[in-house]
């Protein structure tokens, strides 16, 4: 079966623990991810939601695997756009590997569907979000483009 996949690798001057917190804790995500935050208990098998600033659920799914501070796997479905939601669930994997004074972050977002609209969308969004995360951890300042939820969404 054909699938769609987006892979992004970056190196961030931080510790695995700090990067893990930045990926999972609302006080961090709101700073670099357009004011969004996760709602979950961060236990395997539990529900996961990505909340947007007005309280709507942007994306939802389940925590599939969690190995703090090394690996996080989420089942992920868009909740905003009916045609994207209809594609069903994707899988998003974060791998954190210490590399001296840095951490190698590998993100793989994939779906068992050829030419997935969701994977097309996240391939546009993840580079900006993860660049802003890197900037926040290395300089203390997120990128301006990701500080606020886009108007009209």
Name what the model sees in each region.
Residues 19-20, 29, 48, 63, ...:
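Hydrophobic pocket/interface hotspot
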Residues 81-127, 146:
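Beta-strand/loop substructures that line and gate deep hydrophobic ligand-binding cavities in soluble
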Residues 10, 60-65, 90-97:
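Hydrophobic/aromatic beta-strand elements that line small-molecule binding cavities or substrate pockets
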Residues 3-9, 47, 58, 71, ...:
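Intrinsic-disorder/low-complexity, polar/charged segments enriched in Ser/Thr/Lys/Arg/Asp/Glu/Gln
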Residues 7-8, 14, 27-60, 147-153:
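Short beta-edge strand/loop motif at the mouth of beta-sheet-based domains
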Residues 16-17, 64-71, 95-104:
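A short, structured loop/turn motif at beta-sheet edges
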Residues 54-57, 65-72, 78-80:
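Short, charged/polar surface micro-motifs in flexible loops or helix N-caps
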Residues 135-153:
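Short, highly charged C-terminal tails/helix-capping segments
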